[in-house]
Amino acid sequence: MSRGLDALGDRFEACFPAGAPGWRTLGREAEFPVVHDDGTAADVRDLLPLLSRAQPSLRETREGGMLVALRNDRVEYTLEVGRGTLEVVVGPAQDLHELQARHEEARAPLLAAAKARGVHVLGYGIQPVTPATASLMTPKARYGVLLETIGEPWLWFTLTASDQVHVSISRDELVGATNLCNLLAPVTVALCANSPVFGGRDCGAASAREHQMGEILADTFRHGMPGAADADARALVRRLAEQDLLVLRRGGEIRAGGGTFSHHLAKLGGPDAPEAWDDFLLHEHYIWNTARPRSAIGTLELRAACQGPLHESGASAALGAGMVCAWRELQTFLDAELGDAAWPTMRRWHGAVIRHGLAADEPVPGLIAGILDRCETALDARGRSEGRLLAPLRRRLAARENPAQAALSALADGGIRGLVAHAART
């Protein structure tokens, strides 16, 4: 089946444009916890009618009769795994300034709807009080199947809220940029961790989101940093294919998979089987590495950031865009600083920053500053003054305090209600 997987790898690679990268466009998927005054999860389905009335151009998407999304040409509002979390999707945008303006334009009606319902939209990475239970899960069919196949660890998805940025990439840089951005996962976590409180208490990790999600099929590195760099697109697809196949779509219905995807492909008879490509795309959609290429839209998606403070919500997008724009320079920098020990060194640091944020020692003094410098240079080379959007991250680094550490201070000063007020501040 190795040849069959190589054929899939070639097809996957061909989904990205050939040649040198052109002008990079950007997109953003921002997930927001919505809570009551006491920090317990609100039901975001109550907000959808208000959003629809405020924006008549929004079109409904339903699943099994349930309203699951609203979208127009500017924005998409989508129910997340947890019924207390709403995702706001915008893009493609031509630069970070447009991306942020589009995001704020989309977020404003959400904040107004929440205010009308007496609930709070949080710039925070997890539900702070309500536990992960099946009753919190949005009743979409595929979520039920994933609970069946993964078990209770899947329920962490009902709590978490990430801030994902998409950056367009070319075929020639597909593997190099993906490897580099996966390697830089601890930098994103160090600067953008923001989920230290859930279940109503300090959980002992700056990014409980990354810590808990990392427990999902951890032996195969299904979430977060992969085990190692991939040599080429074929190797990338082979790695994905050795993961468990969790779900399949047949006749418009989602059902549980079984075994690895490579085993499933062999049963189909190889990559030329009518179902093979669509089955692979659904399979790889449910592998949650820090950086993952999205073949349908030709982007690299960066996933390590928790949802950040509302008044600094563009910072993680700027970081992700900078990493992709500067990936070659950053790879050279890491090779010089860490050499052959880069992956094991960064993996150890990843564990440290998940727990301690910017209080964790860097592997090499000045490593984060050097990375930010190269990101800023690459962004400014685009000629649109985007590098200045990294300023919140430089302030965090100078203070050695990321959003998680600030959230813990708010909890200490005012309890859960103080944390809610802090995380709802715009």
Where in the sequence are the language-model features?
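Loop-rich catalytic cores of soluble enzymes, especially ATP-dependent carboxylate-amine ligases
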Residues: 125-295
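Terminal catalytic/cofactor-binding subdomain
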Residues: 1-153, 159, 193, 297-298, ...
